[in-house]
Structure formats: structure tokens, C-alpha cells
């Protein structure tokens, strides 16, 4: 993979693929919890095959020490997917994605509490402007409890909260890293999501038609399995700031897909809100941790 594609090309490809996931999720007729479970299963199978082909091994001793954190982070990853998929149901793909990209702001807010890091003026400005961006994409006229649009944004922010939890827990997991850690988190997500799905909606694969199967396999194998391989292979080779900049191809792609493929509209105010969220979260990442 490394010989065929440059690290920059791998990351750009991964971000472009990540940005199209909403298009496929919309056409899979199962619950969000069930879809998250299948995504984890298919991705784990794909990564397991990748490890076999590349002859990579994961140290069992390191797994034992990190097991509680891996279970917690894997569970958070699973529920992060569930809430993001729910967000796609209630609002546009672009607004759901922009809400989801509030995750770095949540991490910035919690790091001082967990790691005794100080928030400087720059971090406070980024928090304030990103929050303003969320208010703008919500729309003042939609701030009512019965609004489907607002419900979608809340699901997106909930997904951002769980994703921020995964990021923060990863800082405590030191024995295993990168794609190996993600593979173990997929397994942990499966362990958490199986009882959740059985206790809620149950298994409903009989509802999935031919197109649904194509979309499901695409989300699990391509958007998660293959694309995670590209993503982590690229991260090992690229400088942190370049990776941070290129990662914003994901939400930009999602917005373009939402508007030009799905025909979903964005008002000028929502566009300004999206620019505030993405612009200030990117600024917060640049010049930070390397």
C-alpha cells in the first residue's frame, strides 16, 4: 500500500471516502444500533485479514493491561456511530457532519480538567467561535424542542461527545497504538453493541434488500476497514499539522455531497456557521500538539 500510494495521497483518499459515508448510511434499512454493530464486525474482519496478509501481531500482554480502557473506548466508539447515524436521519448530512466536528472543541475543554493543561486565549476564542457556529447552523427559528432539525444537531453533538471520549481515552492507552488499537476497539464495540442491539431492535437483516447490502458492505468494508488502513498508514508518515489540515477534506466532502448529490440546502447563515466551526477547530489544532 505504501509503495503504491504516497502518504499524502492515502490520507486524502481516506478523507474523501469518509466524507461520503452519509450518502450510503441513508440507504440501509436497519436501526442505527444494528448498523453500528455490522460496521464494527465488517471492519474487524477486514483489519484482521489485513494483519494476516501483512503478518502483523498484537502483543497479548499489552492487551491485558489495557483491557478496561479498550472496552470503554470501544463502547464509546460504537455509540458515537449510533448517534451520528441518528443525526443523518433527522437533519441534513452537512449539518450532522458539522455538528460532529465539534468533537475537537470538547477535547480542548476537557484536557485542562484531565491533564492539567492550561487553556490559553487562543483556545477560548476557538471554543467561543465554534459554539457560535453551532448556534448559527441550528438556526434561531429551529430552537424548539419539536424541531427534527434541532434533534439531528443534538444527535450530532452527542456523537461528538462520544468521539471526544474515544480521543481522550486513547491518551491513557499506551501499550497498543494506531491501527492495532483501533482493531481492538472494534472488537470491544462488537462486545458492547451485541447485547445493546439484542435488547433494543434485535437483528433485522431480512429487511435489507440488494441495494441495502451493497451500501452495508461499502460502509463496513470500504468506509471503515480499508479506509482505516489508509488513514493510519498515512498518519505514521505525515507531519501532524499537514495531517490536521488534510483531515478537513472529510467534512468539506460531506457538505458538497449533501448539497450537490442529495440536493439538501444550506442557508447563508448555516454556511457561515460551518466555516466558523471548521475554521476555528482547525486553527486550534495548528501549532498545538505535534
Segments predicted by a language model, with ranges:
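Hydrophobic/aromatic residues within transmembrane alpha-helices
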Residues: 28, 35, 39, 87, ...
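Transmembrane alpha-helices of multi-pass small-molecule transport proteins
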Residues: 30-79, 106-110, 162-166, 183-201, ...
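Specific alpha-helical transmembrane segments that line the substrate/conduction pathway
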Residues: 34, 41-45, 85-116, 159, ...
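Hydrophobic transmembrane alpha-helices of multi-pass small-molecule transport proteins
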Residues: 47, 51, 71, 119-141, ...
